[in-house]
Amino acid sequence: MIRSYRQRGHLIAKLDPLELLKSDYLEELHPESYGFKKEDYHKKIFLDGVTNKQHSTIKEILEFLREKYCDTIGYEYMHISNPTERKWFRDRVEIADDFQFTKNGKEAILNKLIQAEGFEKYLHTKYVGTKRFGLDGGESLIPALEQIIKIGGQSKIKEVKIGMSHRGRLNVLANVLQKSYKRIFNEFAGEINSTSEDGAGDVKYHLGASSNREFDGNSVHVSLTDNPSHLEAVNPVVLGQTRAKQFFHQDKERKKVIPILIHGDAAFAGQGVVAECFAMSGLPGHNTGGTIHIIVNNQIGFTTSPRFARSSPYPSDIAKMVDAPIIHVNGDDPEAVVYAARIATDFRLKFNRDVVIDLICYRRFGHNEGDEPSFTQPLMYKKIRSHPSPVKVYGEKLVHEGSISKDHLNNSIKKFKDLLDDQFKNAKNYKPKIEWFEGTWSRYKPESCLLYTSPSPRD
């Protein structure tokens, strides 16, 4: 029974914030399947250290297993062939008592959620109908990324390379890479134009950025790679950049530079380049020491429901080809999301292997903000329109448990809104600089990129 929970407990975990998915009754997760009767539930059983206990009752074992494997996090690690890795993961789930957050930690998570949600709402208000491919519904991604970078800094990581498509990119740029809000507002207003020196002229949700982030006195250089609209095409580019950075850092152990790839659920399961990158991940000439994959699983691919988009239960199933552990987590529980990021980062740093976080959330608006999603998913969007935002869910949880006051929550939201108002006011006069000719590239000078066409033989 204990083994069944380790293998299949995720199938009845509370992973869907919309509660659209109904869990099946699984006989192997019930004591009756193993010959136990109701009157046996309070009898002591000798466990010999299994679940880190010598003796326990059936009732206590069930409570323990359901808490660890069937709450807002579901784990898949029993498919891992390496017994050391499998035991490490099992002990981390069952024995480690680190799924706890201090008052300051909870406030830090809340503040990142306020930034993520407040930024999307502000753009939605100021630039109605403008494409931004918002993160609305998946805002827990932001505190998760913060956690990965923070742990990386504590582990003396020098650089983090991030690759992602357009969904949520502006939010990551602003609230993780610290690209100024006024610059993004300036781009929305159409004030920034491509010059003959930069030759860019790309849409704002394709652009990259880089910055130095400091956590607890540790500095980490974080960069987000530019990408095209072609989903997952950026993956091999990020992995190649990571490998090159490791070379220049003389990082033979692959622990100074780590890649993070952020995927959509439909693209992760459907795009062949994902499987190709997994297939090459263990090769000596291509190995980067493991990638942290985060699937922003909003349970829809443009207008396609999951049951019409893939043949496997989860979009993450393709990762089992390389024995990658998979952590499924409910996006409406930001503490669980941050904890999942913590485990994933620790696993990658210890074993130098790929790991996947399946962040199950939803997409509050259409594929882009000009679409009306209720035409193709009427039942889903009826549910979404009445569903509270992550800030409301988590903020009320903290107020209820006494971690913060209602006034503190409202003041934090207002303070961030005031900051955005100030940035919006100054956006029109913002003067950008060509940042990609700095640092290592400072000895190179931009050439004119004005289009020139050679005369053809017919001219």
Predicted regions, residues:
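Conserved thiamine diphosphate
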Residues: 215, 314-340, 386-407
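Beta-sheet entry/capping signal
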Residues: 10, 149, 156-161, 256-260, ...
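Glycine/aspartate-rich loop-and-adjacent alpha/beta segment that forms the canonical ThDP
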Residues: 5-45, 49-64, 72, 180-183, ...
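Cofactor-binding active-site loop characterized by glycine-rich and histidine/acidic residues
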Residues: 161-323, 327
